């Protein structure tokens, strides 16, 4: 078991305060959502979901050359800096085997979402190729529209519909396909009621109107599943055994530290050879992902050599 100290990744492009003037020049629509803090400093109205969406649009255009990005109302609008952190820490993990970050890695994004955020960042930063799985037809259509609207992305990102709501990797990872890593931002609530309660807390903290959080607060399949995050990840762990020779590293975000012990036990039960925890922090928010592999050091090196 190994762990890193929390902190924004040094390669993350969002280390400093947003250059709002530059972002507004890239995406003029952001201008109408600027406000002043009590200290008189210019900021974005984070209580307004449309403002957060405009900020995301500007960040993706300014830093990642995504000139066309949009999501339908009701789907998650992810914070770009935190999503970028996952990608950079994953890059470090992949680089540990050979001493350098791979530039032609194949990555599977489980639940790519309407926003397609991880493939957009990973393809730009490292030239990785992504397969994104998605159970929602509406989310998949949105992600596909983003890919088609931006030159070159169709060569880097492909999408696959998960038609079996009880499966995670099955039906997505095909025979004779190999992936350097999988990543996932799993649903963390165990019921729609719990998801609504979480959204309500977020709304109150931001001072939003009751309807605002519904605009980009997330769909049910993005926020909740039966049994919650632990049950979902346990299923992922169990299913990963089937693809133990086709995937170098399986990874997933874990929203709460108290969820880790049962997941570690599940990983021991399936015979994971190595388990890694990566701690991350964005502002006041603490997060982490766990990674596991069924290959020892020599097998991982051979996997990479053979794949290349």
UniProtKB/Swiss-Prot annotation:
One of its GO terms (molecular function) is 23S rRNA (adenine(1618)-N(6))-methyltransferase activity. Its main location: cytoplasm. GO terms for biological process: rRNA base methylation. The keyword Secreted does not apply. Keywords: Cytoplasm, Methyltransferase, rRNA processing, S-adenosyl-L-methionine, Transferase. Gene3D superfamilies: Vaccinia Virus protein VP39. It is found in: Cytoplasm. It catalyses: adenosine(1618) in 23S rRNA + S-adenosyl-L-methionine = N(6)-methyladenosine(1618) in 23S rRNA + S-adenosyl-L-homocysteine + H(+). It comes from the Bacteria. Its EC number is 2.1.1.181. GO terms for cellular component: cytoplasm. Signal peptide: none annotated. It is an enzyme of class 2 (transferase). It holds the Pfam family Methyltransf_10. Belongs to the methyltransferase superfamily. METTL16/RlmF family. PANTHER family: RNA N6-ADENOSINE-METHYLTRANSFERASE METTL16, SAM-DEPENDENT METHYLTRANSFERASE. Specifically methylates the adenine in position 1618 of 23S rRNA. This is Ribosomal RNA large subunit methyltransferase F. It comes from Salmonella arizonae (strain ATCC BAA-731 / CDC346-86 / RSK2980). The gene is rlmF.
């Amino acid at each position: 078991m190994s762990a890193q100290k929390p902190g924004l990744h040094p390669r993350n492009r969002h280390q400093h305060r947003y250059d709002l003037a530059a972002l507004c020049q890239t995406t003029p629509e952001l201008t109408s959502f600027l406000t002043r803090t009590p200290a008189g400093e210019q900021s974005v109205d984070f209580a307004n979901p449309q403002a957060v969406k405009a900020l995301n649009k500007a960040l993706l255009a300014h830093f990642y050359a995504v000139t066309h990005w949009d999501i339908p109302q009701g789907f998650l609008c992810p914070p770009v800096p935190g999503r970028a952190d996952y990608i950079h820490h994953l890059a470090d993990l992949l680089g540990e085997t050979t001493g350098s970050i791979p530039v032609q890695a194949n990555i599977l994004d489980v639940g790519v979402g309407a926003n397609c955020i991880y493939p957009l960042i990973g393809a730009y930063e490292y030239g990785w190729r992504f397969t994104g799985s998605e159970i929602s037809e509406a989310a998949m259509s949105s992600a596909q529209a983003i890919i088609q609207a931006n030159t070159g992305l169709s060569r880097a990102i492909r999408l696959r519909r998960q038609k079996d709501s009880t499966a995670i990797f099955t039906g997505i990872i095909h025979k004779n396909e190999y992936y350097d890593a999988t990543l996932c931002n799993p649903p963390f609530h165990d019921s729609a009621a719990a998801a609504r309660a979480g959204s309500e807390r977020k709304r109150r903290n931001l001072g939003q109107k009751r309807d605002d959080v519904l605009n980009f607060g997330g769909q049910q399949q993005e926020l909740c599943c039966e049994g919650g995050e632990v049950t979902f990840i346990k299923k992922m762990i169990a299913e990963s055994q089937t693809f133990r020779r086709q995937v170098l590293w399986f990874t997933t975000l874990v929203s709460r530290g108290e969820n880790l012990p049962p997941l570690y036990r599940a990983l021991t039960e399936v015979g994971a050879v190595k388990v890694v925890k990566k701690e991350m922090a964005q502002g006041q928010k603490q997060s982490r992902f766990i990674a596991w592999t069924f290959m020892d050091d020599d097998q991982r090196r051979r996997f990479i050599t053979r794949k290349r």
